[in-house]
Curated annotation (Swiss-Prot):
ATP binds at residues 30-37. This is DNA replication and repair protein RecF. It comes from Actinobacillus pleuropneumoniae serotype 3 (strain JL03). The keyword DNA-binding applies. It is found in: Cytoplasm. Gene3D superfamilies: P-loop containing nucleotide triphosphate hydrolases (3.40.50.300), RecF/RecN/SMC, N-terminal domain (1.20.1050.90). The gene is recF. It holds the Pfam family SMC_N. The RecF protein is involved in DNA metabolism; it is required for DNA replication and normal SOS inducibility. RecF binds preferentially to single-stranded, linear DNA. It also seems to bind ATP. InterPro entries: DNA-binding_RecF (IPR001238), DNA-binding_RecF_CS (IPR018078), P-loop_NTPase (IPR027417), RecF/RecN/SMC_N (IPR003395), RecF_2 (IPR042174). Disulfide bonds: none annotated. GO terms for cellular component: cytoplasm. Transmembrane segments: none annotated.
């Protein structure tokens, strides 16, 4: 679902912008600190209700303002949506879809599936399992309508169980939580396993395109020993969990691991190879969504030229062009965009950013 218009008010150094966007490539060029990454961050905020750079909203609101406001128009065929989000220094958030209040962040996220590729995004590969669970759960959120409620209830029950571990004296007092928790854990883990297996060939094929010299393997680990009853594991681990103060085993420990030629990717790949692999994973997942749901996925790419040689940049540009997706790309100079062939398409847009101001 491409964005056709974007209005930004008081988001970091972007005080007042109104942009008409291309459904294809949108290039944002400017020096460091000009505001080009902030533009990507604003789009990301519209689709997630949070930033990919800071979790403190007061750092995102322009220093002279009391709030920021983001508004966008989404076009898909004959359908249009108007979406907006306002964040105040007090912490209050107002969401609107087609002028109506009472919406949730998940409603915005459903309308705007997007993948972000940033220099910090290597945590998907060399960070903890949390980042890889988020990768899987993003796909599941857009793939299965029932996933979000199961996932949210699972998080709620885990939080309640962890709090109860500090209060109960016997397992009998905790068992009511565990009966429901075990059911949800099995459901969520089965969804994750099925999705991971369906995505695996897409990942391997895309990795072969970008990194033909490597054999990339993927594997899903549900967070407890496969083939065992999670309810029994919870019961058997009660004393240990009570001593630690939290649930040590379960779907909250799941992981989606990547290996190159049989070894952990973070141990053997260069930073350039890791970035290519990260790009391949994001592209594979976005393209899988398009194939399964016939929905477009936005791609936000910050610092396109970083750590990629000209040949690899051209490969990435070619693959993105083929996807037919709406793409937002930042770069310091126009020269860095040569591999994106931006000057060859009349349907692309090029924006120059300087001190929070944009010119087209």
């Amino acid at each position: 679902m491409p964005l056709s218009r974007l209005i930004i008010n008081n988001f970091r150094n972007l005080q007042s912008l109104d942009l008409e966007l291309s459904p294809n490539f949108n290039f944002i060029v400017g020096h460091n600190g000009s505001g080009k990454t902030s533009l990507l961050e604003a789009i990301f905020y519209l689709g997630h209700g949070r930033s990919f750079k800071s979790h403190i909203s007061n750092r995102i609101i322009h220093y002279q303002a009391e709030d920021f406001v983001l508004h966008a128009r989404i076009d898909e065929g004959q359908h249009q949506w108007s979406v907006g989000i306002q964040k105040k220094r007090s912490g209050d958030t107002l969401l609107k879809i087609n002028g109506e209040d009472g919406n949730k962040i998940s409603d915005l996220a459903h309308l705007l599936p997007m993948q972000v590729i940033t220099p910090e995004g290597l945590t998907l590969l060399n960070g903890g399992p949390t980042f890889r669970r988020a990768f899987l759960d993003w796909g599941l959120f857009h793939q299965y309508t029932e996933f979000y409620s199961c996932w949210a209830n699972l998080k709620r029950l885990l939080k309640q169980r962890n709090a109860a571990l500090h209060q109960v004296r016997s397992y009998a007092e905790l068992k009511p939580w565990d009966i429901e928790l075990a059911k949800l854990a099995e459901i969520v883990s089965q969804m994750r396993a099925s999705y991971a297996e369906a995505l695996r060939p897409e990942i391997e094929k895309t990795c072969q395109f970008f990194l033909p010299e490597l054999e990339i393997g993927v594997s899903f680990h549900q967070g407890w020993e496969k083939g065992t009853d999670y309810a029994e594991i919870l019961a058997q681990g009660f004393e240990r969990d009570k001593a630690m103060g939290y649930t040590m085993i379960g779907p909250q420990k799941a992981d989606f691991r990547f290996r190159a030629n049989g070894l952990p990717v973070e141990d053997v790949l260069s930073r350039g190879q890791l970035k290519l692999l990260m790009c391949a994973l994001r592209l594979a997942q976005g393209e899988y969504l398009v194939a399964q749901k016939e929905r477009q996925c936005l791609f936000l790419i910050d610092d396109f030229a970083s750590e990629l040689d000209p040949i690899k940049r051209e490969l990435l540009a070619h693959r993105l062009r083929e996807s037919g997706s709406q793409v937002f790309v930042t770069a310091i100079t126009k020269d860095q965009l040569n591999q994106m062939q931006w000057q060859e398409s009349e349907q692309d847009s090029l924006f120059q950013v300087q001190q929070g101001m944009l010119t087209k």
